[in-house]
Curated annotation (Swiss-Prot):
GO terms for biological process: L-tryptophan biosynthetic process. Its EC number is 4.1.3.27. L-tryptophan binds at residues 29, 254-256. It comes from the Archaea. It comes from Methanocaldococcus jannaschii (strain ATCC 43067 / DSM 2661 / JAL-1 / JCM 10045 / NBRC 100440) (Methanococcus jannaschii). The gene is trpE. This is Anthranilate synthase component 1. Belongs to the anthranilate synthase component I family.
Amino acid sequence: MIIKKIKMDVCPLDVYEQIRGENTFLLESAEGVPKVARYSILGKAEGKVIFKNGKLKVESFTEFGDKAKDLEGKYECPLDALREVRNEYLKYIDISNIEPIPRFKGGLVGYLSYDIIRYWIDLSNINPKPINDLKFPDAEFFIVKDFISFDLKEKVINLIAEDDEGIRELERIIKNAKIGNNDNKEEKTTENKDLKIKSNMSKEEFIEAVKKAKEYIFAGDIFQVVLSRRIEIDLDNLDHLKIYKKVREINPSPYMYYLDFGDRKIIGSSPEILVRTDYKDNKRLVITRPIAGTIRRGKTEEEDKELEKKLLSDEKERAEHVMLVDLARNDIGKISKFGTVEVTDFMIIEKYSHVQHIVSNVVGELKDNYDSFLAVKATFPAGTLSGAPKVRAMEIIEELEKTWRGPYGGGVGYFGWDDLMDLAITIRTFVISKNKGYIQVGAGIVADSIPENEWEETERKGMANVKTIESLLK
């Protein structure tokens, strides 16, 4: 692999428009902590791997993408299958020449569905069971060799390819983006019309689920559980990239993504790390960064500070956050060397365009015999999307939610060739299939939750996303 650095004088989205289409991706950072929101990457896939119903399928678009075809078949866990794919491609690729790049050097880009938990957590005895109506893959990842990386801190674009011909192709894409040439625009007509919207749970059903969850809390089974419902929107002829552009405008975040798998698209803007690995001082670190506690931004600097104080003095928000930090420490502790787990940021405020969050940072040094795939398994799913204790909370989710979650509450991001991994929690995300858009919204249920208020919380979240679509139809 070779690398060419050029001045950053064009934005990632403009460059992505040059290649948009099936089997392309954009992972973009806009706001947040600089060490998190530093890189944006985009490219065309060499192939993709799909894990579903215990089986791995490999689709290749190039000769390189075909290298893992022999790995197709049954596996006990999608993470095991992804590891085998990663290791197979390492036989054919040399990343030693691009070591100066701190993060992504190529690898697997895609998503893990929440429902992969079923491969290592036994939920078979839970009744009633949610239905798997949409039948999304358990995991779906692009195979990425040649790509473009934007370093927002250094203000440079890294062109990374296997050979000079690949570099020239990436240069051509950048050049066309700079001069505004775009023969690749997808123009779809839109009409000003009422959206067709439906929820997989009625208000009465959701409120009953909250009441049942509170019974489990008072019985001592759990401290908290996150219950969610799914909203379906008919997208008609809407250009899906316009949805990403609007989400990017309204809710810029450290983790924004547009993954075009053809039949399926994953479009979102998540503020929260699920888990990531890093190297520092010859140590392999595993990191998670729980977010719990949110309040709006102030209209003035003075009001902003007052709202920050209000959030940090809210005993309910603080108690929930501390509980989730303890859960994160426990998860990270399973895979870290003894005595290395620490909370490096505790209950700090991070400010975004419209909201401010309470955030903590939990770090550990990864055990010698653990890789990024085992790190995901130990921390998946995020406590902020399941509850605590985590396994019992997931059992209650299984009982009370109507359908499988699919990508919602899982992870989206990458596994690098070099075992660096970075996954965001899949929230604030549109999942598109067969021209239907699905958005899942949840509420954290605790002992003093008021069922009506929890429904209203999901309604606020859901309608914010519906308005995003409505604004594109005017």
